[in-house]
Amino acid sequence: MNCKKIFITSTLISLVSFLPGVSFSDVIQEENNPVGSVYISAKYMPTASHFGKMSIKEDSRDTKAVFGLKKDWDGVKTPSGNTNSIFTEKDYSFKYENNPFLGFAGAVGYSMNGPRIEFEVSYETFDVRNPGGNYKNDAHMYCALDTASSSTAGATTSVMVKNENLTDISLMLNACYDIMLDGMPVSPYVCAGIGTDLVSVINATNPKLSYQGKLGISYSINPEASIFIGGHFHRVIGNEFKDIATSKVFTSSGNASSAVSPGFASAILDVCHFGIEIGRFVF
């Protein structure tokens, strides 16, 4: 983990922990019989990725095979020799890490002493996995889409893409229910939500419908604030991601080809993730 991730995580967790304990409630009936109130919440979400296997192909040409860079790549991005000497990992597919640090969400909602509804915005990012840590100089982030015969030992006529991470920004409308327990400060809750995700895959952002579920328990600190812990499940509907820009056209001679130019590619990837959530309500 680098220093940037540590700083961002520490800062946002601190903000969640020290939200001011002031009331944002609006009583809508008599003061001795309040029915509903507005609330805000913030939470930290360590998340596990549960993505399918990614497949990627060019839009305008028939992709015969996908090659990854060799594991001991020296970091020189423009090869002086044949391309098939560096793109040697046949049938390469990007995989993603879990997200233990950079998952956060905030919500504004309306609670009715049991039922509640909220609008939630969340942010999560999943880095590309370096399998076994064996790939040097970020070689695991690159692949070549080869249009030549797939029987060759390396990429010959191809374009290249670079994949650093997958980012998922969710805009969700959740319907929730808090189970009130008489005389106890704890309240189990359950939520179901639908919305839209802005999913960035290989630097191309595609809007997608999505749905999620949440289950947890909250603990009332005082009438104006609660803390909660729970689990969540989130799934993106639709697995095709378009408008992925390709770059750096290579041929077997190692030079850019005037006949084959960069264009766009599409990827197929099932996006699903789950994890825990820890946060705070302020009423």
Predicted features along the sequence, with ranges:
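Transmembrane beta-strands of outer-membrane beta-barrel proteins
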Residues: 41-45, 120-122, 191-193, 230-232
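Outer-membrane beta-barrel translocator domains and adjoining extracellular loop/strand segments
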Residues: 52-59, 130-136, 200-209, 240-246
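Outer-envelope beta-barrel architecture signal
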Residues: 32-40, 113-117, 184-188, 223-227, ...
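Cleavable N-terminal export/targeting peptides
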Residues: 1-36, 283
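Outer-membrane beta-barrel "beta-signal"
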Residues: 46, 266-283
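Gram-negative (and chloroplast) outer-membrane scaffold detector with strong preference
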Residues: 107-201, 279-283
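Glycine- and aromatic-enriched membrane insertion/assembly motifs of diderm outer-membrane
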Residues: 59-149
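Residues that define the transmembrane beta-barrel architecture of outer-membrane proteins
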Residues: 36, 100-104, 167-171, 205-211, ...
